[in-house]
Amino acid sequence: MLTRRGLGLAAVATGALGVRPAWSQTPLSAEQQFMVEGRYLPQYLELKAQAAAGRPAAGGFLAQFAAFLGDEATAIGGDERDRPADAELPDMSDAESRDALSAIVEAATDRQIVILNEAHNISGHRGFATRVMRALRPLGFDTFATETFLQPQQEAAPSIRRYRRGDPLHSGFGYYIADPVYAEAVREAAELGYTFADYEWRWDQRPPATASGDEQIAAREAAQVDNLGEAVLKGRPDARIFVLCGSSHAREREGRGGLWFAARLKALTGIDPLTIEQSWNWPATRPQADAPHVAAVLKRFQPTAPIVVSRNGIAFANSDFEGRVDLSVFHPRLDRVAGRPGWLAADPLRKAVEVSIPAFEGPALLQALHMQEGMVIPADHFLLEAGQARGAMMLRPGAYVLRLETKRGIEPAFGEIVV
């Protein structure tokens, strides 16, 4: 039985609860929605808006992020300019070409380390890196090291060193892994028995903010070499390593910016790496915008698959790389296949799988995710056209969940397929 005193206390308590302020909370930023929820569209649309508004820094970030979504028109074409009509192309009359994968395998037979570079806005470079990684495994290459794998941080973070086949793969292992093409390379490497090594510089290896650009480069390159040695060569001096790095890091000889990763690695360890340039050799989205050296190669050889090109026994490349790498890979201009990039369809392990798409509103991504991993980085995804009812996924064998990401967020999965 309630007494007056009990009723009074209850009223006080209820009143107190009623006026208690809610805990402070703030909406997630577009970047947080990407990093925490795995949503790509908010960050993509925000970067597009910033670039359209003329924010200088947004363009570079947009190009890299657009590559994650398969938007090559933005990632590659955003900064393209036509060559001058009177631009002179390099003389290729004495140039020679070979199939790129065959040449790399042959050259790597007696090498301990292979270093391949990429441009961070070209997903196709990651597709080619996947095929190189696959081809090197039968030669005994056992370690996959990439610039994007995160080193230990001040705060607790996942480590790629512990990643094993079938584990959920998420962008906490490294920023560029958010590109599904990159993520599939890592998954396949685990399936093939590779171990993984991170070597990027740590927060405690960075010079003061007042350091010059060249000092920043020198500190980073030296730290990368030290870290690769500590992570791999110290404990496994005979390990055979495939390294995927950003553009300039693959230079084996001094050039603009000084001594880069490959050159410092060779000097410190005495190991002569096989260095491969592809970062500046990708076709533009329009032939008239091809760089002169790319236009010359495509005109001379008309390749249908990646090739390595040399002149007088020297790898042919632009002025930053010619004479500073062992091999230079050029990629063909390929037609799209089932609405998807030709380079993606050219991977012999991927199969074009046409799926029906539920109705949606506004911008949307069609995504296929590995069934056993849960809701992490897709195995494949691409931006849909308004009203698109069917689309082709490019998938390796396995079981997948299909879903859409729209402006509202991640929609419930709508289907399962087995390839």
Language-model features, listed with the residues they occupy:
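Compositional signal for N-terminal targeting/processing segments
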Residues: 23-419
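N-terminal export signals
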Residues: 6-24
